[in-house]
Amino acid sequence: MGNLRFYNTLTRKKEDFIPIDSSKVRLYVCGPTVYDYAHIGNARPVIVFDILFRLLRHVYGKDHVIYARNVTDVDDKINARAIREYPKLTLNDAIHQLTERTYDQFQQDTEALGCLLPTYQPRATDHLEEMRSLIERLLEKGHAYIAENHVLFSVNSIKNNPLYGVFAKRSLNEMKAGARVDVAPYKRDDMDFVLWKPSTQQEPGWKSPAGISVLGRPGWHIECSAMSMAKLLTPYGGGLACDDLSVNVFDIHGGGIDLIFPHHENEIAQSCSVFGTERMANFWMHNGFLQVEGRKMSKSFGNFITIRSILESNFVEFSNAMTDDLKQSWAGLSARFSMLQTHYREPLNWTAQRLAQSSSELYRWYELLRCERSCLDNGGVIDASLISTLSDDLNTPNSFTLLRKFYKEENAVALVQGMDLFGLLRQEWVREIECPLFVKGIDLDSKFIDQRIAERLLFIQNKEWAAADEIRNELAKKGIALKDEKDSQTGERITTWEVK
């Protein structure tokens, strides 16, 4: 087995990853709320944890990793959007239309981004019984209470638990000041949060737990506790019925850094209180924030970008022979390529230039593979240095340095295996001779770049420095960085280039 080390948000340090059971490595990631098109901020955790899923499958075997990513299909934002978009339908029918349409679109978008399907994609509305069971257990143990047909989690019931608040690195007073809590007279404490709430006659509702007579719907946090239990604990060891506490803990929980508080803090409180464990998951991994052109992404700033808009944009000049499906697949892999050049825990600045440059570099990689089509038939052994680098807390920037090295060395076999590991390979684009070229234009022609470098070297020999600098600047604007050095054998000046 490979030596995997990941940064654990729970301990704030990198640790060796040792699964509870290497024959069933278990990963849970918070997924979409299906009320609107997914944006590029949503795309980042989808891509990041797809890379983790691929690495775990490589190390432990494809059949020995369980990846669950939930779908939230009950939410007040869903209700409001459904009423607005389907005013002529009943609310339940409108919600069904909206959530099905949005879910299908999310599936198409993530496929275009090169992501594998998770093992499970549980929907909240399919796991209401598990939610009710968890809530009733919390009531029995004194960690929850009923008030005005709501069920609320009592934070004071576990305030002596050393884990509560440690995850978010906040004191109770800090969390009270910073949390977006509903001001409600029925709460015993401002920090208490909703496990279940009543529905009006106009809102969707289901049978409530603990004999509450009115219909209701779950709170946000209980959904993930229930769905992770259903898919990672119950089939594995019996979930609630199992006395072995270690079985009621899974290996990795992932999500965006914005979910640390209150969502993940409250998930931990719920699950640990039900199962009597000190941990919900042994590792917590979080991806960093995403900005657009140096600013927070916001509709008010005019920089709100959906995955769909990227897939349908002409950010490079495409070949006329390309179909719309092929263009969208190319755009999706270019976006994936672009995101993976930043370490998952670091902030990511999304720019149009960065996307175009990623497309340019990816295109050249495919040029090499298409010239060496036999690379597809040379076994499936991935370069050990690539696995070692990725195993160090998913270090994709250093991994891409190795992929660029393979490209420069024209090592098509190592490059194709690396691209496959990172979800960047479409074998049919390499194998099919008649597959149309993906992009066109002199900007992406390596022969043109080599020609301009030769012209620049001639200008340097003639001491025409301004003309030489003009070529360097011209290529820099296209994302091409030049590096001047001396040949170790002849001492002559040589110039190499790479995409930045």
Swiss-Prot record:
Q: Which GO terms describe its molecular function?
A: ATP binding; cysteine-tRNA ligase activity; zinc ion binding
Which residues are listed for ATP binding in this entry?
Answer: 299
SUPFAM superfamilies registered for this protein in UniProt: Anticodon-binding domain of a subclass of class I aminoacyl-tRNA synthetases (SSF47323), Nucleotidylyl transferase (SSF52374)
Q: Where is this motif: 'KMSKS' region?
A: 296-300
Enzyme Commission designation: 6.1.1.16
**What is catalyzed by this enzyme?**
tRNA(Cys) + L-cysteine + ATP = L-cysteinyl-tRNA(Cys) + AMP + diphosphate
Q: How is the cofactor bound?
A: Binds 1 zinc ion per subunit.
Q: Which InterPro entries does the entry link to?
A: Cys-tRNA-ligase, Cys-tRNA/MSH_ligase, CysS_C, Rossmann-like_a/b/a_fold, tRNA-synt_1_cat_dom, tRNAsynth_Ia_anticodon-bd
Quick check: keyword Aminoacyl-tRNA synthetase in the entry?
yes
Supply the name of the protein.
Answer: Cysteine--tRNA ligase
Q: Which domain of life is it from?
A: Bacteria
Q: Where does it reside?
A: Cytoplasm
Q: Key word ATP-binding present in the record?
A: yes
Q: Where is this motif: 'HIGH' region?
A: 32-42
Q: Which UniProt keywords apply?
A: Aminoacyl-tRNA synthetase, ATP-binding, Cytoplasm, Ligase, Metal-binding, Nucleotide-binding, Protein biosynthesis, Zinc
The cofactor named in the record is: Zn(2+)
Q: Report the GO terms under cellular component.
A: cytosol
Family annotation (PANTHER family): CYSTEINE--TRNA LIGASE, CYTOPLASMIC, CYSTEINYL-TRNA SYNTHETASE
Any single biological process term in GO:
cysteinyl-tRNA aminoacylation
Positions annotated to bind Zn(2+): 30, 224, 263, 267
Q: Using the chain's own numbering, where are the disulfide bonds? A: none
